[in-house]
């Protein structure tokens, strides 16, 4: 197999598998193609021309029915057989009896069916009888033996497709394990048949790989959009669930198409929303009330009424264009056309122009805060929507955020035509005729999910004309909790409520310049909230315009109507753009990506996920290091890795896979080092065993990591049963490890390499460079975000859970729950007191005992007013003379259906995950390429140390993070000498070149001098644990300037930490002192769905998180001395690894 240049996506392609790799045949055979040619050539050259015959009523060849037919199948015991049977049951039975000198028994002369066959066999009383039940390639055998035989010969019947046949003969067969064909002596299977059998027929592998669906990134040109941009302010309310944040203020602004904005403004005015700005064009609407949940109820009413208005508007539009619906409704016995159900409407052929209406509820960080606070009020879908609409909902809480909360009201699209020509899809276009429905979509979108930065930083990054203000949150909180707050001499909120002195003075000066009299904290908070909404509204417009320009110019899709808010996150947008570029390059002409890239599913999904190994992050030195340290960082590590070749195509069947594995084994036996771009090696995912070289040939940057001990460890121990990519196999082999490929049915080999994402990364790099030249900060931010987000979309982890409201459980889901396919994992209820309409107070009822004489116990007034009809009626047999009283607690009548506020978390009963969205193997290979980068990096530092024991080596690196390495002065010298071609300052490529295949990556020194820009170092540093370290300063060896250092403390409040604090913490622990170092920070606990009694669903509670600061205790490395750490190895094994590995020793067999 050889590597050739692609004419589509730039990359490396392999030639089709060579025809010589075919299964060996036991005898001569004639290929079907040759047989056809031979048959065609055998026709008589001088054949007489056909004579025109008279026209016949029936055409076609008359073929006599074959007397004997045959099938091949597998018996219960696994044996393959061929069953020959007679096509005519009656005549075959008669001939069989006559041959054995018997007359046909009367019982067998009756019509024989599948149901009466066992009874008739017992009546015939043959010495031995069999029934073979055939179903989908397998046969189930049932035996009968007569105690007093009437027939001396056996009867054998075949039941196939509901019919009964008499078996003539049963003979053994063989079956090809690669293509599933049955044969007796010889067999030759084709590559196409082997592939089809493996991917579509074989029960164990037929559902391992799924095609990835595709839809263009654009939207119909006539889509109507409305944006409701809002923000809320909260105060702390102390309740039974802790300090709960309660909104008391909500401000929103309306953007979008003019007619939709006007409709929403009219509705806001009707519902008495206050106006913050008198200008109608930029008016903001707000509501202020400290009443708990009142804000949510009012906002819910606005959103529900808006849904009803647009739904009625769309239905009126359809009704005007289809007046015949009035007649259809009358024919169905309905008074109003809107009473037609969604299923009934699908049967009618609608006319007219479709409408596509999208309403976005937008805010900054609302999916992690605001929407959770309001969710108990706004999540309901039960609005007054005509039943003619088909309603669907996508509600997905994940990791403390509302990832999706979308509702769609849809009607059939009269313009819909199934696509046959997909050329416009290659340009990212979506026509009205491509969509099956016309719709109204209500979607929640978060600008934080599209920018990954605070609103203050987003205003700078996207060059907005307004900027975020400041608010004394704690003062507002105390005002609502206590009725007052601390003020300075001028009546301004005290300094303690502000971030620092600078923020306090700046805001106080602004207040004084406004000259509005006494400080009104509520008005100031309203102005602050309104300013946030204005900033967010500008950001929304900026994102829409800038992404449209980016798609048009940088991606070169000028005809695409792209809306970045159509997808909720930057990751989902980057993945959609990547698939669009790939679709344009490969032109599959289908509604999916064909076999260009496929998604692992079911058993294969878990297998591929096992090959995804995380980043490297650990110190090899604990304590204070009093020597220079340089910090190197890989430039755009994931982006560079994405430009390299990746596996493409439909995975090979077991036969071709075995041939490809043999090529790897041969290369590892014959060559000490193997090229990553060897033409004979195909990409794959393998199960391996690997043994490291001798102890003195190891280093502190192992080529691979393992989870066998329960935690991810970068280890030099022997590897057993690890799932790796073919790149890791080469990396381990080149580092001196002995790698053995273990037979595994899940082992996957792909037919070719392709640079699938190279074009995507290249255009983002070009856009970023162009933005730098033109100083376009917005385009630079977009290009950088999209470039970094793609890898994460491939690594998305799926699960079998989904959260639904009770009213979303349709008949198909209910059936799956009843059958056990789904299990209700938990049920949660949103806060119900906000839905309360009426409360009946507590009351007591006393019930008198049952007695045969009611008049004797009843008061006189009762007897006179309600005389009994039969005063002599008998009472019950057993009398009860004790009074019984019942105390009824207050009854709450809810203004909602129970289905509206009951959430169910459903989980599939099977652990297997169906995946048709993400090519997870791409994420695995991205990380494998990064490990190859670091492996090459380690050779620059440690190649000369081979043969020297680890404890005698010079310290060259002290800390390694995912894409960075902290080196000593000796490590810096080696990088300047041996690794100079990988230094960005010396020039080099960040994008892989298919014409000159080699590892492509660059690093740069992150510790730079602030004055002259030269490489600088930290004169002293301290390392306590992974992601917990500090650099004292940055000292420039050129100009001697000493700049500020760097501190990293994940999970801690870094505002209270410094280099001296971390240093003191280390020495206190070393000397076993009594000092305790800890940090505290305010944390927000977001709860969406929960089964815990002390946690209320859809709430945000405020808690103080305190963490102890201390050196690394539960290390995942071996301590060589008081400071130095080395990875586990044979000499120093991982104490956590208790897993038993069974091995077969050759000398004992």
UniProtKB/Swiss-Prot annotation:
This is DNA polymerase. Pfam families: DNA_pol_B_2. Residues 1-28 have a biased composition (Polar residues). One of its GO terms (molecular function) is DNA-directed DNA polymerase activity. Signal peptide: none annotated. Heterodimer with the terminal protein; this heterodimer binds to bp 9 to 18 of the genome. Forms a complex with viral pTP, DBP and hosts NFIA and POU2F1/OCT1 for initiation of replication. Residues 1-49 are annotated as: Disordered. It comes from Canine adenovirus serotype 1 (strain CLL). It catalyses: DNA(n) + a 2'-deoxyribonucleoside 5'-triphosphate = DNA(n+1) + diphosphate. Keywords: DNA replication, DNA-binding, DNA-directed DNA polymerase, Host nucleus, Nucleotidyltransferase, Transferase, Viral DNA replication.
